């Protein structure tokens, strides 16, 4: 594994209209980095949440990145090489369709994944997906 990830969710009890956040505390291994959003074509570390009819996603909150200099290519790109936190904000919709979907089951499953490509100073490794899921109680 190229990094360690600890996930948490702000609440496991949901009601229509409630806002939630999923936090991903990421620590790259020594000499490793992952790509941050920026002006490059590398695979950015990304939060993907499986679509649900009762869920609205906000853009992922990314912390400030560092510039990594690839000496062999004389290329500078935005990366994370130190511990950082990604936060995915979500809203449980308060619509008739959302209420109907939420009424069918409790607990409900919120699932997704963290996708990234890790590199060290010599090699970029195959893209990786780390699945995450939470059981949410509907009130």
Where in this protein do the model-derived segments appear?
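Extracellular/lumen-exposed scaffold segments
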Residues: 1-139
């Amino acid at each position: 594994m190229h990094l360690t990830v600890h996930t948490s969710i702000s609440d496991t009890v949901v009601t229509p209209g409630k806002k939630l956040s999923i936090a991903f505390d990421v620590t790259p291994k020594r000499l490793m980095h992952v790509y941050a959003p920026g002006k490059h074509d590398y695979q950015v570390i990304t939060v993907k949440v499986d679509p649900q009819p009762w869920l609205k996603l906000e853009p992922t909150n990314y912390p400030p990145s560092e510039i990594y200099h690839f000496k062999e290519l004389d290329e500078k790109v935005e990366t994370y090489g130190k511990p950082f936190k990604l936060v995915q904000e979500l809203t449980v919709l308060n619509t008739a369709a959302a209420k109907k979907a939420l009424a069918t089951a409790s607990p409900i499953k919120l699932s997704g994944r963290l996708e990234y490509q890790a590199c060290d100073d010599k090699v970029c490794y195959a893209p990786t997906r780390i699945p995450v899921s939470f059981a949410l109680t509907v009130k």
